């Protein structure tokens, strides 16, 4: 599978959906703190998405019950918001998708709740650096397999092992 270049009109539609994702993540970043539940973060995220004229794309997708995926600590991705209350030292991933007029936006962030261990700081930095590395090397018609291999090598060189 190759990466398809979109037309300017399609990019504008994708941009709108992704702007709402970015605004929602920025909003939720301010709410991530000790004492807040994952269900509350989801409620705030869904309401905010709707207030901006979009639909929470993940809600109902394959039966997923929420608009915001909340992954805490050992949960890798696509965690379901529950009654868990965030605590100092937690690492939380927020993954959000929006739909506007049939066009989708999707992004995620990893955040710390207060202070986290140096090893956790290093792991998060590696993930962020890997993202920027991928952006710097991606080219039109590049195959996902090629990009995945390059990222694997980047991560291994930093002393981490990608999930399989």
Indicate where each model-derived feature is located.
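Active-site neighborhoods and metal-handling regions in enzymes and metal-associated proteins
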Residues: 1-164
């Amino acid at each position: 599978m190759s990466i398809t270049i979109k037309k300017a009109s399609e990019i504008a539609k994708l941009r709108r959906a992704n702007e709402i994702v970015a605004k929602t993540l920025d909003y939720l970043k301010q709410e991530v703190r000790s004492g807040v539940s994952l269900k509350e973060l989801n409620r705030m995220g869904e309401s905010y998405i709707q207030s901006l004229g979009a639909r929470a794309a993940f809600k109902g997708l394959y039966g997923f019950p929420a608009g915001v995926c909340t992954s805490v600590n050992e949960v890798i991705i696509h965690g379901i918001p529950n009654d868990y209350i965030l605590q100092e030292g937690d690492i939380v991933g927020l993954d959000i998708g929006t739909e506007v007029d049939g066009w989708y936006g999707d992004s995620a962030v990893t955040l710390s709740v207060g202070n986290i261990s140096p090893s956790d700081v290093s792991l998060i930095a590696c993930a962020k650096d890997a993202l920027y590395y991928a952006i710097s090397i991606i080219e039109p018609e590049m195959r996902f397999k090629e990009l995945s291999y390059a990222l694997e090598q980047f991560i291994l060189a930093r002393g981490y092992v990608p999930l399989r």
